Amino acid sequence: MPSPRRSMEGRPLGVSASSSSSSPGSPAHGGGGGGSRFEFQSLLSSRATAVDPTCARLRASESPVHRRGSFPLAAAGPSQSPAPPLPEEDRMDLNPSFLGIALRSLLAIDLWLSKKLGVCAGESSSWGSVRPLMKLLEISGHGIPWLLGTLYCLCRSDSWAGREVLMNLLFALLLDLLLVALIKGLVRRRRPAHNQMDMFVTLSVDKYSFPSGHATRAALMSRFILNHLVLAIPLRVLVVLWAFVLGLSRVMLGRHNVTDVAFGFFLGYMQYSIVDYCWLSPHNAPVLFLLWSQR
């Protein structure tokens, strides 16, 4: 049988009023038979003081310590200063730019393709028997034969129109040598590893490969000849074919990478635009033509 309900003082709720008649109006009992009311208020106050776990969690989440993301025990300790940032050179670039990735990929493809096309790089290569012919083609695009040939023709020319064309051809060759030497000295890209340094009459900057001087000269001379010499169509095709094969031979001999030759063609094409814009004539350079005619 259930136990009788007891009050806050431990007495049964059903005791007679005579047992507490010694203090009928006592405040402890609420006075005047209000014992049940006191017991009801006591139960309410005890329930109100109880801790609700849900409310406790909400209050903890709203506390400033929890909002800062640190534990309450750690917040009670001494504050720690943040770690100093790493130096700029020690940081790892985890987000490389698209341009950097594209350039690295292009460089890898360039080196791989140049090595595959270097079939005449040595006598023991797959096309080593064609190497002497490629070296002869190399001489046809060298700067010294072109300079000597232009000077000889300029000295032998007896017409003003011929001298004008040859004077500008000499200007184009000197401009080509100057620009190629300047870019090679600035870029300083080494020649391919499979190249043999047995080239014809090299200078100090010829140990660098970017850009290809033979490619720039081939593009410049072919465009110059096609614009200032009246040639039949087969000869015009032969000039273009010579320029293309000369550039290809630079890769087959292992002298240059593919990008060296490609940029050389572009540079030579643009060099002729400079020469055509600064075209020398007896009208804009009379002193130069007068001095040359007196020789």
Curated annotation (Swiss-Prot):
A GO MF term: phosphatidate phosphatase activity
Transmembrane feature ranges: 133-153, 165-185, 229-249, 261-281
CDD domains: PAP2_containing_2_like
Residues covered by region (Phosphatase sequence motif I): 184-192
Membrane topology annotation: Multi-pass membrane protein
Noted pH dependence of activity: Optimum pH is 7-8.
Residues on Lumenal side: 154-164, 250-260
Stretches the record annotates as Disordered: 1-39, 61-90
Record key words, sorted: Endoplasmic reticulum, Hydrolase, Immunity, Innate immunity, Lipid metabolism, Lyase, Membrane, Nucleus, Phosphoprotein, Transmembrane, Transmembrane helix
Cell compartments where the protein resides: Endoplasmic reticulum membrane; Nucleus envelope; Nucleus inner membrane
Region annotated Phosphatase sequence motif II, chain positions: 211-214
A GO CC term attached to the entry: plasma membrane
Biological process terms in GO annotation: cholesterol biosynthetic process; farnesyl diphosphate catabolic process; geranyl diphosphate metabolic process; geranylgeranyl diphosphate catabolic process; innate immune response; isoprenoid metabolic process; phospholipid dephosphorylation; positive regulation of neutrophil activation
Protein name as catalogued: Polyisoprenoid diphosphate/phosphate phosphohydrolase PLPP6
